[in-house]
Design a protein with these regions (language model features):
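Beta-strand/loop-dominated core regions that host nucleotide or nucleotide-derived cofactor-binding catalytic loops
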Residues: 67-75
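Short, charged beta-turn/beta-strand-edge "cap" motif at the junction between a beta-strand
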Residues: 20-22, 45-50
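Short, compositionally biased
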Residues: 32-33, 50-67
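An N-terminal amphipathic alpha-helical segment
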Residues: 1-7
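Short alpha-helix capping/helix-loop boundary micro-motifs
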Residues: 1, 25-29
Length: 75
């Protein structure tokens, strides 16, 4: 089941499945960071910003931007 990165609690691995339609500027920012569908993220913190790790790189996004990234939880 797909949800947004902003809805994931810390300690969870997720796979990026896509982006929410309607805000090309936000999607461009996310893509500029190198975050693409298929990436596996480990959420390190969920509040006040979403902090996650991709490989050996950590990122922090505000909840609005994290809410544009569609993910599924790893099982």
């Amino acid at each position: 089941m797909s949800t947004t990165l902003a809805n994931i609690r810390s300690g969870v691995n997720v796979t990026v499945t896509g982006f929410v339609d309607g805000d090309e500027g936000a999607v461009s920012k996310i893509l500029a960071l190198g975050i693409i569908p298929g990436d596996v993220l480990l959420v390190l913190a969920a509040w006040p910003a979403v902090v996650f790790e991709v490989g050996s790189t950590s990122y922090a996004l505000d909840n609005e931007l994290a809410g544009r990234i569609l993910v599924t939880a790893e099982t």
